[in-house]
């Protein structure tokens, strides 16, 4: 566990993957991982316990060392899934959770360490990396934000930006932003494969 903080991990894997045209969770993973989901969970296991995977109803997933939580309704966006994950993490005793997307093939435990360090210093509700833009789905969230998310969702909000705007959020500028790379298209996937070759 990072800095002895009770830290859960939440992987958002239930997105529609419209630009990719197929489920990102089952795309080939880097560094020997069979799939992206297995890779991301493997990174989180190094710093987080427990780990929750937020998935779409009926979405086929590979076997991973994580608890799978299915969305009740498909296509609601990341905010409701994050809220459900934070609630599960709070019930498991975690004060913070690292929330990330499944499509992060360069994710590293060092990113989590940097976020935990700032959270420990500031007690912020949200700590998010910034590299010219904010990365909501590679951030640390306090688990007690689940109720605030419920209120935002009840009011019609679906974007993570709504939560950030309603929270005490701290940003950290990362010297190495490649850990934040994600894959949204087949071209992104090919570029990643070429970079690894």
From Swiss-Prot:
Enzyme class, UniProt record, top EC level: transferase
InterPro entries: MobA-like_NTP_Trfase, Molybde_CF_guanTrfase, Nucleotide-diphossugar_trans
Keywords attached to this entry: Cytoplasm, GTP-binding, Magnesium, Metal-binding, Molybdenum cofactor biosynthesis, Nucleotide-binding, Transferase
GO MF annotation, one: metal ion binding
First and last residue of the signal peptide: none
Domain of life: Bacteria
Protein name, per record: Probable molybdenum cofactor guanylyltransferase
């Amino acid at each position: 566990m990072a800095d002895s903080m009770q830290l859960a991990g939440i992987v958002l894997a239930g997105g529609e993957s419209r630009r990719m045209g197929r489920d990102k969770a089952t795309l080939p993973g880097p560094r020997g991982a069979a799939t992206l989901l297995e890779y991301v969970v493997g990174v989180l296991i190094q710093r987080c316990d427990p780990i929750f995977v937020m998935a779409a109803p009926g979405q086929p997933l590979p076997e991973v060392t994580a608890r799978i939580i299915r969305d009740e309704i498909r296509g609601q966006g990341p905010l409701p899934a994050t809220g459900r994950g934070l609630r599960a993490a709070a019930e498991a005793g975690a004060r913070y959770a690292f929330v990330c997307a499944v499509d992060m093939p360069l994710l590293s435990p060092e990113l989590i360490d940097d976020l935990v360090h700032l959270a420990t210093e500031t007690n912020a509700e949200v700590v998010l990396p910034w590299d010219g833009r904010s990365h909501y789905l590679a951030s640390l969230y306090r688990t007690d934000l689940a109720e605030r998310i419920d209120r935002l969702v009840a009011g019609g909000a679906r974007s993570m930006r709504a939560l950030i705007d309603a929270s005490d959020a701290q940003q950290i500028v990362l010297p190495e932003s490649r850990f934040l790379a994600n894959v949204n298209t087949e071209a992104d996937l090919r570029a990643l494969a070429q970079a690894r070759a």
